[in-house]
């Protein structure tokens, strides 16, 4: 009997194996179908190919987040937007992964859910599931997958979840995965570890380990460049190292930011011809309004440039618009990729059309024509826009531009730099190269490359007495030239400067690594494209990766996507506690890297959470770096006794510092000090029983629900919010502040929310009401004194007799006073409180 059962089992297993063999792995079919569709949409490249691309590209930054709503959106996309072919491909991938344990199909599924590839919806939970399975199948040998998994555990799947996170946040596990990925050669994982040791985040601070890791990455990056790229023409890449909050007046608002804007690649517009600079170039006074940049069409029959202007000033403005149109195509913008071929064609036609008539051009036209020639010569020299460089044409056009510049005092910087490189590396004329470099050293076109080349020449030809190579390289580094950062770091480490420290050397290598955006941070572009494509969760995932790598701009962008401060009378963002905590962490990390505004925002979030001790610590740190908003906030907290004992004298000192650091806030500062005097006087009169201005104070900072006393203006805010929600439907209320609009390359818009003057000046609602009352009293006093003087009343102003029309009028007023009824005597007193 037992033998019979064994035979039956063997037969059944054989049947199963035969059936399994008869069903082939569908991965080849799925891969073939995936190759027939686009992996992702590139809106920047699409804009570059359009003849009339829109220069105002907007995207939405969500304010609210709910895991339940995300799941609803995911299901809705699958039901309404996914096509039958997509469903078929997905089923093939799932079948290959589940039934055949195909590692390639499993990895493809993880990337589909992580990056919304092939137009599938984002799902962090499924991405985590397939990444875990892929690593199990490959025995943790794929460094890219291990790095993705490490970021998931470091961020808790970007802190998703409701009561419990979908992916647990485990810093220790993330650290182990980072170390494993780094051992397998993942440069990004090494960068994460180097940043952790440099900043002391989740690990003990160790500059020696940080230096070793950053130096190792820097050496590999240096080897990735060819000799021509490193020494002659360093590659130009489109940088997306930008904070998305800077498209919306920064983190704190217009006039309050301490950190310069990171948006350096917006569309260039021609300047106002009425500006002093243009008037000086042209030699006459002119007035002309800035107009949007137009496009130029190429006429293939006669090779002419067709503009879209036909007024009397078109000929003069035409060359200006041609230059800026070509410059935008050459450099690219955040919403439009580079189109060097179109820029080169436009400049070649400009050269063909204007060169025969260059003697008839006015100074303004000559100025911009020279810039066109220099850009065209530079493109011939680098080979951009064509298959290979044309050194002969580059030298000819650049020399022509210098000859025209000598006659019309035009710009010479770009031409001198390129001609210096040609003489140094092509014709080997060192003396002529040095001459060109010296002419270009003080020009705006010098980004540090001049000092970089002179430093190398000073080392190779000391007899030329160019200067100290170390000092020249340091100047090139300070100007931001990327190869100079590495060369200067090597000089420092070799002991050329005995005053340098390990921390300083690690910082230099860190700066070089972070600057190599094209290799170390290509996901910056992916994140920005995801925002334009309305995939904010994909953008958040990309920015979170880069934030872990130590990019300050990515830390701010990731935090901004997770939590934004609400406006006055606006509901706070509805999100999870995990996201809010992670946002604070990223803001704090950015603050430690020099972003003062991020520290203020982190303090504001703690302030809203009524954790006043942490808010005070962040404000104090930002105030030490001269943040106007942080100093103001410290005065406010001392005024109301939030996190510290109430101290009007110290609050006054902080308010005075605001006007000392920035005179634009003089009025706001003085009115706040006046309010302090009034409150101090009332407190003394009532023996500290006045609490009209006291904001809410928590009974227990750890409790979510608090029943503390709330100031009247906060109660009014809540009443207005309840009235709005009562009038709106549930859906309308949910969508009422679902998104905040950001417009790229144009004016800043926030939907229907307008930036109030009170926000710019830093006032609270209670401050405005109090100051209004005080101003009302003063205005009433002045009005009464004026009317009394005109009507002949007997008026004393602070004890002084008011006499506007001489002694005779005074005698008449005294007679009228003697005959008039009682009550016509006024004694106006203004007290200095």
Curated annotation (Swiss-Prot):
Topology in membrane: Single-pass membrane protein
Glycosylation sites: 101, 123, 142, 429, 611
Spans through the membrane: 768-788
Keywords (A to Z) from UniProt: Endoplasmic reticulum, Glycoprotein, Membrane, Repeat, Signal, Transmembrane, Transmembrane helix
Pfam families: Sel1
Protein location: Endoplasmic reticulum membrane
Entry keyword Repeat: yes
Signal peptide start and end residues: 1-20
Complex and partners: Component of the HRD1 ubiquitin ligase complex which contains the E3 ligase HRD1, its cofactors HRD3, USA1 and DER1, substrate recruiting factor YOS9 and CDC48-binding protein UBX2. Within the complex, interacts directly with HRD1 and YOS9 (via N-terminus). In ERAD-L, HRD3 and YOS9 jointly bind misfolded glycoproteins in the endoplasmic reticulum (ER) lumen.
Role played: Component of the endoplasmic reticulum quality control (ERQC) system involved in ubiquitin-dependent degradation of misfolded endoplasmic reticulum proteins. Component of the HRD1 ubiquitin ligase complex, which is part of the ERAD-L and ERAD-M pathways responsible for the rapid degradation of soluble lumenal and membrane proteins with misfolded lumenal domains (ERAD-L), or ER-membrane proteins with misfolded transmembrane domains (ERAD-M). ERAD-L substrates are ubiquitinated through HRD1 in conjunction with the E2 ubiquitin-conjugating enzymes UBC1 and UBC7-CUE1.
Protein name as it appears in the record: ERAD-associated E3 ubiquitin-protein ligase component HRD3
Phylogenetic classification of the source organism: Eukaryota, Fungi, Dikarya, Ascomycota, Saccharomycotina
